[in-house]
């Protein structure tokens, strides 16, 4: 599975925060999807693209995990 996350550069999120987010996503997703590749970059808008998932249910599960990681900001500390 491949995850592409684009963060709007106008949000002024530091590279260390993006690195921490990437690490936390790997920590939560790799046990379920060992071949996961995540790319987080800054761009002109916010967006998420998931590829390599067969079932819509898998896509929903991954999005749910990503949402949980984003909302639980304990990984920032």
Swiss-Prot record:
Q: Quick one: signal sequence residues?
A: none
Q: What is this protein called?
A: DinI-like protein in retron Ec67
Keywords assigned: DNA damage, DNA repair, Transposable element
Cross-referenced Pfam families: DinI
Source species, please?
Escherichia coli
Which InterPro entries does this entry report, sorted A to Z? DinI-like_sf, DNA_damage-inducible_DinI-like
**Record's family?**
Belongs to the DinI family.
| One Gene Ontology biological process | DNA repair
């Amino acid at each position: 599975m491949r995850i592409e996350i684009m963060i709007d550069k106008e949000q002024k999120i530091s590279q260390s925060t993006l690195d921490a987010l990437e690490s936390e996503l790997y920590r939560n997703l790799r046990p379920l999807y060992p071949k996961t590749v995540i790319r987080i970059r800054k761009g002109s808008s916010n967006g998420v693209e998931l590829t390599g998932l067969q079932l819509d249910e898998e896509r929903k599960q991954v999005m749910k995990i990503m949402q949980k990681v984003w909302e639980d900001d304990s990984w920032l500390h």
